[in-house]
Amino acid sequence: MAAAGGGWAAACEKFRSARTLSAVESRKDPETEPYRSKYSARALLQEVKQQLSAAEDCGEARLLAVRRAVLEYELGVNHTDTEELSAGEEHLQRCTQLLEPHRLSRDCVSLYIQAQNNLGILWSERDEIKTAQTYLESAEALYNQYMKEDGNPPLDPSEHFMAEEEKLTDQERSKRFEKAYTHTLYYLAQVYQHLEMIEKAAQYCHTTLKRQLEYCGYYPVEWALNAATLSQYYLSKQCFMESRHCLAAASVIFSQAGQVPSTEDNETEQDQQDLRQRKAEIARCWIKYCLNLLQSARKLLEDNIGELDPDRQLELKAQRKKEEDEKENGRKKAVLFGTSDICDSVLAMEEKVSSVYPLDFQEAREIFLVGQNYVQEAKEFFQVDGYVTDHIEIVQDHSALFKVLAFFEEDYERRCKMHKRRIDMLEPIYADLNPQYYLLISRQLQFELADTYYEMMDLKVAIGNRLEELDSHTIKKINSLAQLAIKYYELFLDSLRNPDKVFPEELEEDVLRPAMVAKFHIARLYGKLITSDSKKQLENMQTSLEYYTFLVDYCEKHPDAVRAVETELELSKEMVGLLPTRMERLRAKLCPFI
């Protein structure tokens, strides 16, 4: 067939036209005929296939087999694109069968890997993930074997239908081959994620992202979102340096997205909306980063009553000073993204926020402020009107940032003001929320508001204890905060009642601990209310006893619940033993002659 120059040139032209129809013209197909160009491409490929069949007796068996394999591959992808998976599978299988004896040769290896990639995708779409894994791992192994045994840039499949003078340079061949292998790793990352092999999925995702930058084969928005998602994996492993690096790279690469002109002007408005949403999603990942770093530092620094341990703080500061010199070496071992110019931008981005545990208020505040900036950025897109759940989650994260910052603040008054900021942001959104439609979020807000008022009350009591005598203003404030905490805890507990307002005999596992903690805190809050009226004091003690008793009785009836509230149960048992005696003493004072 090579000798029949005119016929071969025509076949090459048809092949090129088919690829153009599939890759370019198909984008312009009307909605009524979404696959018009794909079907036209298929017809051309079938014509070329017939021409090859007619030339089978020309003696160039190996060459013809490879060219037929290219056509089977193109037809396989074409049928898959038009959702004809069975036909697509047949063509792709024929492709690999034709190439099997020569799969490690320079003219076949790239095509064989791409066919296996597409078989992997095809089986993934059928939800046969294990089968997909087999094909993709086979493609990965073949790439590694070829690079070890040969390593020269192999032919691109399209070159089998090109004149000699049109053939690609080695540089272009290498780029296309590496891109095919990057796709293998990308699909493997998804397969491992699906199979819940999370660590392996993260490793493959990181390698894919790195290679996409190296070979300039990526869409900025998609790349940035994948990097931001990967950052959350590293966050779950407490690998803050790696998490920050992924997020910094995501922000830098995302900034390129606005510089890429839209291919279709009529989609520009939607494109801009999508860009704003993606930017807000990356901002939310940054919020989680700052919040997790602060919360992890708190766990390291807190004592057994949840306060900052000064000895532990000094110990960690000394340890960190010792490790400063090793920091640079560790940095170089981290997997870095991109070429030198991208690396410079990423490193500049990283310098805006620490990746080491903050050990005092000033360090914590710097991380808090970065997180707060991203809260504002995320809220610009995720507004209450249209994104209720997302908006509330962002506000909850903002509240959590204030909560953890308050831990580092030594001054009780200033700490109280931080909790007041939380109240000011949470109460308005709770007031506007319909619990009928947003029951879970409503419960979360009730509990958080109750907890915040509870914490403020504790702080006001601690401030009052420093005074020689409690003044009426402080007493009023303590009582007001306690009553507001009780109000929100009761609202939370009421939300657990059935339509007949009856509290459940047995609590669901997801609400067991919050409900028990709410009961325990209400018991304690009634004990904290300050009154000069002994009768009222007795009533409060009685209510307090009832709530403590509920917790003790519930755990006796449901022993499985004990693990969830061990500390609270121990203290409740103690109070159930002490309170009746105290109440008797108080009654004796009220009625001395009885």
Swiss-Prot record:
GO terms for molecular function: kinesin binding; protein sequestering activity. GO terms for biological process: central nervous system projection neuron axonogenesis; microtubule cytoskeleton organization; mitochondrion transport along microtubule; neuron projection maintenance. It is found in: Cytoplasm, Cytoskeleton. Keywords: Cytoplasm, Cytoskeleton, Developmental protein, Differentiation, Neurogenesis. It comes from the Eukaryota. Pfam families: KBP_C. GO terms for cellular component: cytoskeleton; mitochondrion. Activator of KIF1B plus-end-directed microtubule motor activity. Required for organization of axonal microtubules, and axonal outgrowth and maintenance during peripheral and central nervous system development. Belongs to the KIF-binding protein family. This is KIF-binding protein. It comes from Gallus gallus (Chicken).
